[in-house]
Design a protein with these regions (language model features):
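Acidic, low-complexity proline/glycine-rich segments
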Residues: 38-55, 136-157, 189-194
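Second-shell loop/turn segments in exported
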Residues: 60-64, 144-145, 171-175, 206-217, ...
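Extracytoplasmic mature domains of secreted/periplasmic and thylakoid-lumen proteins
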Residues: 16-52
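Extended, charged alpha-helical coiled-coil/arm scaffolds that mediate oligomerization and mechanical coupling
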Residues: 54-87, 93
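A conserved hydrophobic secondary-structure block that centers on an alpha-helix together
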Residues: 64-78, 165-184, 191-204, 218
Length: 314
């Protein structure tokens, strides 16, 4: 993972919020789009062209083009602050992830883990001039422990550390706490929505989406939950029964991944680790790009020379 300061610079380069806001509030450009929409030429546009024009005009309005000057300025301030808070949230989560680690010197603690995972942990320890293995909250390390580690206490410890990152709970409680950041984001999003004439941020968000209202979204989700719950309950009951057979009468959150993998191996004689060999990154990307080309006629070629915040970026 890149150091936070490098990640921050990269993120700000990718999010030119002030430019986007100024562009969206450019009256001359908006008037030009309106004139085009009212022109005889626009009447002969095909569906795609008309949609692009409609969306452009919509986006101007969602940038506050119709607001009085003072409210336009406030809109710009809120957008800038939201960008800053979004970056701070990501950076604090990254810092919290990197702040926790567990140094292991007894290999039996890692019983059940694949050799590839242990090798990564050994490399992480060596990078810090430590003997043995270093477990971190980076996802490959976390996933390996939660899926394969036989040591239930280790899974619980890691689960608690991972799920409480950047919060007022857990082993690093209060450090890099994102709670206040989230509250500020919620408050500013509400203000932004009201500036643009919406009751709440959910309605503002839906202005650019297919769903017509937040009630429609909630209705869809509730219906999906109603249809899915019986199947999820069945799977959970089977997992609990299997865990009980293996000596775990009370299935906890940090047990689900471990016993789920064990049950999968028992039923299908295959493990996630074994499947990895068939899906190297280059093969996966090649397959994905091939599908895109067949479906949409788009050819994707890799750019070899470019500036990035980390050498692994492609």
């Amino acid at each position: 993972t890149a150091p936070t300061e490098i990640y921050t610079l990269s993120l700000h380069d990718a999010l030119p919020i002030s430019y986007s806001t100024e562009l969206g509030q450019n009256r001359a450009l908006f008037d030009a789009y309106q004139a085009l929409a009212a022109s005889p030429e626009a009447a002969s546009f095909d569906v795609a062209q008309k949609t692009i024009l409609e969306h452009a005009l919509r986006d101007f309005r969602l940038s506050g083009i119709d607001l009085p000057a003072a409210e336009q300025q406030r809109y710009a301030e809120v957008q800038s602050k939201l960008s800053e808070l979004g970056s701070r949230f990501s950076n604090q989560l990254l810092d919290a992830t990197q702040a926790w680690s567990k140094h292991v010197t007894d290999e039996t603690t890692l019983d059940g883990l694949p050799d590839s995972a242990k090798a990564q942990m050994a490399a992480a320890a060596a990078a810090k001039d430590l003997e043995g293995w270093l477990i971190t909250l980076e996802f490959p390390s976390y996933y390996a422990v939660m899926t394969y580690a036989s040591d239930r206490a280790l899974r619980e410890e890691l689960y608690a550390a991972y799920c409480t990152r950047a919060s007022d709970q857990g082993p690093n409680a209060g450090q890099f706490d994102n709670g206040p950041v989230m509250q500020q984001i919620l408050d500013l999003r509400q203000e932004l929505a009201e500036l643009l004439g919406y009751k709440n941020y959910a309605e503002l968000s839906l202005a650019t989406k297919m769903a017509e209202s937040s009630d429609q979204v909630l209705s869809f989700l509730r219906d999906l939950a109603k249809r899915s719950k019986p199947f999820a309950a069945r799977d959970l009951a089977q997992l609990k029964a299997y865990a009980a057979e293996q000596g775990c009468p009370e299935l906890a959150s940090w047990d689900a991944g471990y016993f789920g993998e064990k049950l999968r191996e028992q039923r299908y004689s295959v493990s996630q680790e074994a499947l990895r060999a068939y899906f190297p990154i280059d093969k996966v990307l090649g397959g994905l790009f091939s599908i895109v080309q067949r479906l949409y006629g788009i050819e994707i070629n890799e750019l070899k020379q470019f500036d990035a915040w980390h050498p692994d970026v492609r």
